[in-house]
Each structure stands twice: as C-alpha cells, then as structure tokens.
Amino acid sequence: MANPTATFTTSLGSFTAEVFSDTMPVTAGNFIALARSGFYDGLHFHRVIPSFMIQFGCPYSKDPNDGRAGTGGPPHGTIADEHPSNARHSNEPGTLSMANTGRPNSGGSQFFINTVHNTYLDWFTPGPSKHPVFGRVIEGKDVVTQIE
C-alpha cells in the first residue's frame, strides 16, 4: 500500500509531501490525525531560517503577530520519540522532521522542512537534539524554496 500524501496550500502556492506511515507509524499517524482534525488549518510558517529549515505546526501561529507563535503544541500532548532501525531517513533537503524541545518525547504538532542536508539532526547520529524524519516533499519544492 502506498504511503499517504498531504498537500499544503500557502499564499505562495502548494506543495505535496509523502508521509512515511509505513516506517514511521507513530509520528506519521500523529501528523495525519492532526491534519484530518483540521488542527493545521490556517496556521503560518512561524519560523523560517534560510539555509536551514522552515517550521510549521504551532496553533498560536494562526496570528503571525502572536508572541506565543512557536511555543504551542497539540491538544493531546506530546508523542513518544520514534527511532525504528528500519527507518534511517536522514534530514535531507525537502524532508519533514518532527520538532521538539530538545528533551526526549517532546514532539507534538510542530515539524520542520529541511532546506539543506542537516545530518547532525539525524536520530541515528551521535549527539543531542535529534529529529526523526517522517515524510518528504514530492511536488512543489519550488514553493518551499520561496517560503525560505
């Protein structure tokens, strides 16, 4: 069975991502449930760092002037970190990666799209601050570049 896709409609155009429900069922399932519930509707990319990533998923970002943008999470709380040995997806350009607070099991609704290869964020490399990849942009990469 093919992995599901998600289409993001922005003021700069649309892009589509494949969601790795086959290898990242917890993280992908969390994202899909939030998307289907309408949680992500009307949100803005609240953190854009050129030559690094663009971040999305904070409920406070509906108002881009809200000082809390970037601090919110989903109504159900956080999810467990997912590090399956058969899913060593690297934080390559165009991949969707779960954001967290730097503590274990602190991911929830916020995720980012890598715009460069950020291998040091891969959960399977040594060091702190690990972010599991759960999808990749398959159409509209030019829109991601415009947002950046």
Model-derived regions: residue spans:
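Cyclophilin-like peptidyl-prolyl cis-trans isomerases
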Residues: 1-148
